[in-house]
């Protein structure tokens, strides 16, 4: 017969080549995919497979037993219960080799048990003997000490009669020695008896353990508890077994009952039902039959708490956690209150809180990962193997108006800065530039304080940070923040000292200020390159590019070019005609048009790709920024973008992420609500400024929301009712009308339907293109809600010279105005020795019997104080007025 190859044989057997090679290897034949197979080798493989697949001979015995049990019922009537017990046993025929192996193992085990038993007996004997010797020695020492004490006492007592009682003392001493010897002999006998009992007990224990571990038959029956199908309770089965034993025992039921009684040494306490059954069996009845036992609950409460393994997912309700720990929900709530958290039984808590509660109650916690589907989708990706050099990703960071975008404009030879509202960057711009020495990808970040998160994302997605510092301005707050972001991301920094062409430029000052924050130039022994540039004149631009490429060579940046792409979302927005648009920076692999991408909570197929110039491209490699269309929604800036194989699985992962994010968010909100419940009860009235915010890109929504929420104070709070990307729609206007909110549009406009609702409801709609103006106007609106500050201003002082009595007003103070003006009906204070003794209102003010409204400095007048008559000569009346000062938010 002609030999065939492994591949041909695999095709004939309809199996894979790798599995066939593995089967040959299991049979002891080493083959590769292209080797030939002889007929003898085929037969060897077939014999191996037959031997492997042939099952051992089995014998299954089934037994079914039916019986009737009479149980006494109420009213003296008995009730018959039909009992059926099914048993199944399977006997497996042992292989001869396996039987020999089991016999050898049994013999070895018997020898080991015998050796252990002998060692245990010898050890017990030695320990008992040593213990007896120690006890005898200690007893002798104690006797000797007592004897010495008694002798000393006797000696002191009879010291004056020593001559007369010498003989008696000697006789007493001999008697005591005899008693000590007798006590020592008794102690040795007691120790020997204890030693024998201990050795006998150890031998009995070893013999019992050996009998328990001994195998009685090579054909071991395997019995599964699940094969019992019992149609009544456990109590009925026990009653049937006891009835069978009594019938077999006949007249000897008294002896059987005595033998069935539990031993005294049993560590488990017998239940009440067991004791009653035992008494009934001893008493018996007519004809040797015992009375039927009463049905009693035989459950015994566990003596100690059971520690369980509690599996906790990312979120869990309090009730589910209590069920997993087998405790009441009230106990879990009590434990949470001890830890300082309030919860209800249906409240969802996060994984960390549940772990603390379970560990506090003494259970072992197993944290379950619920993202197996996500991990499976991520692992099923073709990522390629060979890494190739890639272009560096450079982020330009610095303070506002220090010339970041102008510097990038000169490099790109475009005028993007003129297109930015107010001349400040409000988006992350991603561009790649071709130079003579290679390609560089630039990310331009905003410098305003509101865009902190956008700068942080830029630092995380970058390889090199170019820190732009104006030579005339020096280090500013956002410059320091950019340094912190770069250090947190562990990214090298290249410093571009801009505006070097200005007369007031001072580069040395910039170096000194940056050195305070750990940015040292190379000439000072540091690691950062300093380049002097001018974005207007173009000075030093080539040196800056060379410094960037030099730093990139030092980093040896590489990425896999072939395979499925992955990257990060730099920016995202909603376009009215194109739908959700995301700016993606590819990190590795190649992104093609038509790929299925998973991006945070969103997914979709790439319908179109455009570069930063707006031109259509079919693919994008590492370090290339592109805009992609076709996602299911607007992703959050900073989300990971991953190309996957299956769109259905991508949708499942995205929905799972959305649900999990919602659960965790609700759990945290509920937790904060309950924790702040008492604080909210004690707070006074708090005014709220409700805002519905719409912006052009996701990064702007994020930055504006953070800036507005930071404006909140104890009296006025900013509440973002709704936010999103895209134009203002009718839904947004309806939401603003329902919540009495201000509509804010940042670089977006309202459509026709929204304008109708706004006009009908007279809503406050405001458009902005610069974030400074937006924040200032919201501050002004909040300042209008602040309650004014009340301030007391003293307007006059009058000294009491004399006191007169008036039937109408009581005591009238004759005063001289020493300072300011005294006005009628103003609040006053009466001061005596510079201490306020009364505060009230000026009721009557007269000058020469005429009522006047005010009296000026240096004039005399009569003052009547309302509801106060204890005015004395020498008192000072202080007149003041309360003025309101409008507060503003800083």
UniProtKB/Swiss-Prot annotation:
GO cellular component: cytosol
Keyword Thylakoid: no
Biased composition (Polar residues): 67-81
Sorted UniProt keywords: Acetylation, Cytoplasm, GTP-binding, Initiation factor, Nucleotide-binding, Protein biosynthesis
Region (G4), start-end ranges: 498-501
Single Gene Ontology MF annotation: translation initiation factor activity
N6-acetyllysine modifications at: 808
Start and end residues of each stretch annotated as Disordered: 45-304
NCBIfam families reported in the protein's UniProt record: IF-2 (TIGR00487), small_GTP (TIGR00231)
Descriptive protein name: Translation initiation factor IF-2
């Amino acid at each position: 017969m002609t030999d065939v190859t492994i591949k041909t044989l695999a095709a004939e057997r309809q199996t894979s080549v790798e599995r066939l090679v593995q089967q040959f290897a299991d049979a002891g034949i080493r083959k590769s995919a292209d080797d030939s197979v002889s007929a003898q080798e085929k037969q060897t493989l077939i014999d191996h497979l037959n031997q492997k697949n042939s099952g051992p001979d089995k014998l299954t015995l089934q037994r079914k037993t039916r019986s009737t049990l009479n149980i006494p019922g109420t009213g003296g009537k008995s009730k018959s219960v039909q009992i059926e017990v099914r048993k199944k046993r399977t006997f497996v025929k042992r292989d001869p080799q396996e039987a020999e192996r089991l016999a050898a193992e049994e013999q070895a085990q018997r020898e080991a048990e015998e050796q252990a038993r002998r060692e245990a007996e010898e050890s017990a004997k030695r320990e008992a003997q040593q213990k007896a010797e120690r006890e005898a020695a200690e007893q002798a020492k104690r006797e000797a000490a007592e004897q010495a004490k008694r002798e000393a006492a006797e000696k002191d007592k009879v010291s004056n009669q020593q001559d007369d009682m010498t003989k008696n003392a000697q006789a007493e001493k001999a008697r005591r020695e005899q008693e000590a010897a007798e006590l020592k002999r008794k102690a040795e006998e007691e120790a020997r008896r204890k030693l024998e009992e201990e050795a006998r007990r150890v031998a009995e224990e070893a013999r019992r353990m050996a009998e328990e571990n001994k195998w009685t038959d090579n054909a071991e029956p395997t019995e599964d508890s699940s094969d019992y199908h019992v149609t009544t309770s456990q109590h009925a089965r026990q009653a049937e077994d006891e009835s069978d034993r009594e019938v077999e025992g006949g007249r000897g039921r008294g002896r059987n009952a005595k033998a069935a009684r539990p031993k005294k040494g049993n560590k488990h306490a017998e239940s009440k039902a067991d004791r009653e059954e035992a008494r009934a069996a001893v008493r018996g009845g007519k004809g040797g039959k015992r009375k039927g036992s009463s049905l009693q609950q035989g459950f015994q409460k566990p003596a100690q708490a059971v520690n369980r393994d509690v599996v906790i997912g990312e979120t869990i309700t309090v009730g589910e956690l209590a069920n997993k720990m087998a405790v009441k929900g009230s106990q879990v709530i009590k434990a949470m209150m001890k830890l300082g958290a309030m919860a209800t039984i249906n409240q969802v808590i996060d994984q960390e809180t549940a772990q603390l509660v379970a560990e506090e109650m003494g259970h072992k916690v197993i944290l379950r990962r619920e993202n197996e589907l996500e991990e499976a989708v991520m692992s099923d990706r073709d990522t390629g193997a060979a890494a190739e050099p890639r272009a560096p990703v450079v982020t330009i960071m610095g303070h506002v108006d220090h010339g970041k975008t102008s510097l990038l404009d000169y490099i790109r030879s475009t005028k993007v800065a003129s297109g930015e509202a107010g001349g400040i960057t409000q988006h992350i711009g991603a561009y790649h530039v071709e130079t003579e020495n290679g390609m560089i990808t630039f990310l331009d970040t905003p410098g305003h304080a509101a865009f902190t998160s956008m700068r942080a994302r830029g630092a995380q997605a970058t390889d090199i940070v170019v820190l732009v510092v104006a030579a005339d301005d020096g280090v500013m707050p956002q410059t320091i923040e950019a340094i912190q972001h770069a250090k947190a991301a562990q990214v090298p920094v290249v410093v571009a000292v801009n505006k070097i062409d200005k007369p007031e430029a001072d580069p040395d000052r910039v170096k000194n200020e940056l050195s305070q924050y750990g940015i040292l130039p190379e000439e000072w022994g540091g690691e950062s390159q300093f380049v002097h540039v001018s974005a207007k004149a173009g000075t030093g631009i080539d040196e800056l590019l060379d410094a960037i490429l030099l730093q990139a060579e030092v980093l040896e940046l590489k990425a896999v070019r072939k395979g499925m792409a992955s990257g990060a979302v730099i920016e995202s927005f909603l376009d009215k005609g194109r739908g959700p648009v995301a700016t993606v920076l590819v990190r590795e692999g190649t992104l093609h048009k038509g790929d299925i991408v998973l991006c945070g909570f969103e997914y979709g197929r790439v319908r179109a790709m455009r570069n930063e110039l707006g031109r259509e491209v079919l693919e994008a490699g590492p370090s290339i920024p592109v805009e992609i269309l076709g996602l299911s929604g607007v992703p959050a800036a900073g989300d990971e973008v991953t190309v996957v194989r299956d769109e259905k699985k991508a949708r499942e992962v995205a929905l799972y992420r959305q649900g999990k994010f919602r659960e965790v968010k609700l759990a945290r909100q509920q937790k904060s609500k309950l924790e702040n419940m008492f604080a909210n009860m004690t707070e006074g009235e708090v005014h709220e400024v409700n805002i519905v915010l719409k912006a052009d890109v996701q990064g702007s929504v994020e930055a504006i929301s953070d800036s507005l929420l930071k404006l909140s104070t104890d009296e006025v709070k900013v509440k973002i009712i709704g936010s999103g990307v895209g134009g203002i729609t009718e839904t947004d206007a309806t939401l603003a009308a329902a919540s009495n909110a201000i509509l804010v549009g940042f670089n977006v406009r309202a459509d026709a339907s929204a304008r109708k609702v706004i006009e009908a409801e007279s809503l406050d709609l405001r458009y902005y293109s610069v974030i400074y103006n937006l924040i200032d106007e919201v501050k002004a609106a909040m300042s209008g809600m602040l309650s004014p500050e009340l301030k007391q201003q003293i307007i006059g002082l009058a000294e009491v010279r004399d006191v007169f009595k008036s039937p109408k007003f009581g005591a009238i103070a004759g005063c001289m105005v020493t300072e300011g003006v005294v006005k009628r009906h103003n609040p006053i204070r009466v001061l005596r020795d510079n201490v306020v003794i009364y505060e009230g209102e000026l009721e009557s003010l007269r000058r020469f019997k005429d009522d006047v409204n005010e009296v000026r400095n240096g004039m005399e007048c009569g003052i009547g104080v309302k509801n106060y008559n204890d005015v004395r000569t020498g008192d000072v009346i202080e007149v003041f007025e309360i003025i309101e000062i409008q507060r503003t938010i800083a």
